[in-house]
Amino acid sequence: MSNPQPEKVRVVVGDDHPLFREGVVRALSLSGSVNVVGEADDGAAALELIKAHLPDVALLDYRMPGMDGAQVAAAVRSYELPTRVLLISAHDEPAIVYQALQQGAAGFLLKDSTRTEIVKAVLDCAKGRDVVAPSLVGGLAGEIRQRAAPVAPVLSAREREVLNRIACGQSIPAIAAELYVAPSTVKTHVQRLYEKLGVSDRAAAVAEAMRQRLLD
């Protein structure tokens, strides 16, 4: 009794460059593990094929006419379709890769990947693994760190003057007299400082200002 053949991974391929698309389709088909169920030359057509066939993986060019690959990934996620979208591009900018993954892509490859690497990435993606080209990992990590870093609040010149005087322990009337403004104006500046620093009292404001090096 022969063992049953493993089910092939069903794939839709979308790319507006016919020669590249045909080469990828041929490589996937010759792998013996993939069944290409549809081809598209623009994003909207790729999305319709995905909705019609519900493939395991959609291998899409990042830049296509109409909808780009990341927009298709976002649509697939919004429709709650089971297909995992794997993008491929000649562009390696970390911001593009990060945004594409945020929009719902399960992976990102470069077009200089070998056919063997593309086939492996498709199979890995079908197994639920997130796939990113090795040469993109360092840049992507840097992009994530940069976006995760807290952004220092933007303070006006007057807010900085008030903040520095608060740090010196001056009272609101004293600050008002020194800056030639009404105490109510100083109170408004203090409240805005609390909001920008994410605090609710003087001590916390000074501590946060010191942490973020906002004091002169």
Curated annotation (Swiss-Prot):
Response regulatory domain sequence ranges: 10-126
Q: Which UniProt keywords apply?
A: Cytoplasm, DNA-binding, Phosphoprotein, Transcription, Transcription regulation, Two-component regulatory system
- PTM: Phosphorylated by NarS.
Q: Where in the cell is it found?
A: Cytoplasm
Q: Where, per the database record, does this protein carry 4-aspartylphosphate?
A: 61
Q: What happens biologically when this protein's gene is inactivated, per the record?
A: Mutants show no change in virulence in mouse model of infection.
Question: What Gene Ontology molecular function terms does this protein carry?
Answer: DNA binding
* Biological process per Gene Ontology, one example term: regulation of DNA-templated transcription
* More about this protein: Was identified as a high-confidence drug target.
Q: What is this protein called?
A: Probable transcriptional regulatory protein NarL
Query: Which source organism?
Result: Mycobacterium tuberculosis (strain ATCC 25618 / H37Rv)
Lineage start: Bacteria, Bacillati, Actinomycetota, Actinomycetes, Mycobacteriales
